Amino acid sequence: MALIIDGRKVAAAIREEVKSEVDRLKERGIVPRLAVILVGEDPASVLYSRSIEKACTRAGVEYELFALPAGIPEDDVVALLSRLNEDGSVHGIMVELPLPKQMNRQKVLEAVSPVKDVDGVHPVNRGYIMSNSEGLFPTTPMSCIEIMLRNGIEIKGKHAVLVGRGESVGKPLVYMMLNQNATVTVCHTFTNDLAYHTRQADILVVAVGKAGMITGDMVKPGAVVVDAGINEAKDGGICGDVDFDSVARVAGAISPVPGGVGSLTTTLILKNTLKAIRLQGGKV
């Protein structure tokens, strides 16, 4: 049976680190502050904003939610972001996705200052990933890296196969894995014989949004399997892209859903907020 990679345990450790850093900043008169912009009432976004607020409260980070109506003009959202960019008391800004269909997603996201972009969605920060420079990076691919490194799983020199090339996880994770000195193969919709490629992986990361698509016969014995997918299960709960039971019998280590990658995302938003303070000229 595979080692179960416990994302909740990793998240708890990072929360303690964040809390300690927040306390040190407050001793110097710096109170970390995160602004979250929620346009409309998407249920998942509302729930996520509440989980971020809870994480902020526990860590001692100030939290401000800007809940805007779905019909608000795009220019008004951009104007709000401009004000927050100029507000020195705001260290991190996050725009909840998805935005209403009538809005230009890219225009809104590019209106966030790169040094306050705690969700790592600005093109400048995406460029920093590619160039292996210091920036603010998206939290789900960060979670994939963190849960491996903090469980003593070596990435350097390993063959990593990524299934999925989405903007939020797959594409940034390609460069994050390269920056960890892995050899990376990317599989996607048009990849022929997916199972052939997945069976070559020392590390297999899956993020496609298709429940149970990776089964035990598609995994190399002893491989590390990181499931970054999230789907609605038949019983009404959530499940990942990996068929957990069959893969756990073959893999050397596996992250579950829930309890794996997703456990870290809100905590890493706070970690990015502290990093943003440093990028803005403060010291953490």
Swiss-Prot record:
Keywords: Amino-acid biosynthesis, Histidine biosynthesis, Hydrolase, Methionine biosynthesis, Multifunctional enzyme, NADP, One-carbon metabolism, Oxidoreductase, Purine biosynthesis. The keyword Amino-acid biosynthesis applies. Its EC number is 1.5.1.5, 3.5.4.9. NADP(+) binds at residues 164-166, 189, 230. GO terms for biological process: L-histidine biosynthetic process; methionine biosynthetic process; purine nucleotide biosynthetic process; tetrahydrofolate interconversion. Pathway: One-carbon metabolism; tetrahydrofolate interconversion. InterPro entries: Aminoacid_DH-like_N_sf, NAD(P)-bd_dom_sf, THF_DH/CycHdrlase, THF_DH/CycHdrlase_cat_dom, THF_DH/CycHdrlase_NAD-bd_dom. SUPFAM superfamilies: Aminoacid dehydrogenase-like, N-terminal domain, NAD(P)-binding Rossmann-fold domains. GO terms for molecular function: methenyltetrahydrofolate cyclohydrolase activity; methylenetetrahydrofolate dehydrogenase (NADP+) activity. Pfam families: THF_DHG_CYH (PF00763), THF_DHG_CYH_C (PF02882). HAMAP family: THF_DHG_CYH (MF_01576). Catalyzes the oxidation of 5,10-methylenetetrahydrofolate to 5,10-methenyltetrahydrofolate and then the hydrolysis of 5,10-methenyltetrahydrofolate to 10-formyltetrahydrofolate. This is Bifunctional protein FolD. It comes from Pelotomaculum thermopropionicum (strain DSM 13744 / JCM 10971 / SI).
